[in-house]
């Protein structure tokens, strides 16, 4: 069944997941600050379906009407709260929300799931997508699986069915906090890998950090 998605953010994962959804035949709108695809750092990705016709300015989000689209947050952890605050009127119209972003709110220290529920009583269903996985692997159709954490069984079934393919699957779970904690550890590991690659030869310590994380 064809679904309508809105991806809020156009980082590497946001673009890769949008491209994958388009390959499956879904309708996808991508909202971001910079709508020029050529300025984005996507040299390592193989985007076959995403084009600038799919991309809209994030400044127009508050003016958009919600018509049953599945909204997926795909901004950085630092930009999560900013997105919610700046576009509060839009999020106030939603019943469900999915996030590729994991971590803690930088101001309150709350889990992002708690932050969403505290801000928006209208959002009844919240889902979290988490690896471990790499955006480029999804683009190159390598076989990967990710977790989809939500407390709503029907929402879980909807996302699992809408995104499954021969090389990608979502594993449903209800352990939202545990997935968020794992995401925090993964973010810390990514920072450490970047530091290790900068100060030592690339890859020497990164693999060890990834395994320990």
Model-derived segments and their meaning:
Residues 1-55, 60:
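NAD(P)+-binding Rossmann beta1-loop-alpha1 motif at the extreme N-terminus of oxidoreductases
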Residues 14, 37, 106, 135, ...:
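Flexible, glycine-rich phosphate/dinucleotide-binding loops
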Residues 27, 90, 115, 119-125, ...:
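Internal alpha-helical scaffold of NAD(P)-dependent oxidoreductase catalytic cores
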Residues 36-41, 106-108, 156:
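Short, charged/polar "capping" segments at the starts of alpha-helices
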Residues 56, 63-143, 159:
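Rossmann-like NAD(P)(H) cofactor-binding subdomain of soluble oxidoreductases
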């Amino acid at each position: 069944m064809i679904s309508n998605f809105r991806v809020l953010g156009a980082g590497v994962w946001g673009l890769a997941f949008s491209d994958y959804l388009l390959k499956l035949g879904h309708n996808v709108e991508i909202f971001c600050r910079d709508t020029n695809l050529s300025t984005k750092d996507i040299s390592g990705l193989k985007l076959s379906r995403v084009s600038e016709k799919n991309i809209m300015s994030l400044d127009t989000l508050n003016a958009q009407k919600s018509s049953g689209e599945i909204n997926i947050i795909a901004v950085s952890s630092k930009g999560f709260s900013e997105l919610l605050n700046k576009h509060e009127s839009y999020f106030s119209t939603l019943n469900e929300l999915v996030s590729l972003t994991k971590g803690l709110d930088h101001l309150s220290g709350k889990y992002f799931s708690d932050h969403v529920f505290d801000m928006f009583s209208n959002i009844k269903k919240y889902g979290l997508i988490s690896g471990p996985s790499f955006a480029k692997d999804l683009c190159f159709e390598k076989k990967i699986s990710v977790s989809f954490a939500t407390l709503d069984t029907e929402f879980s079934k909807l996302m699992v069915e809408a995104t499954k393919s021969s090389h990608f699957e979502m594993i449903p779970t209800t352990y939202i906090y545990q997935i968020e904690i794992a995401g925090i550890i993964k973010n810390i590991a990514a920072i450490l890998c970047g530091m290790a690659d900068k100060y030592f030869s690339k890859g020497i310590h990164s693999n060890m950090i990834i395994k320990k994380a």
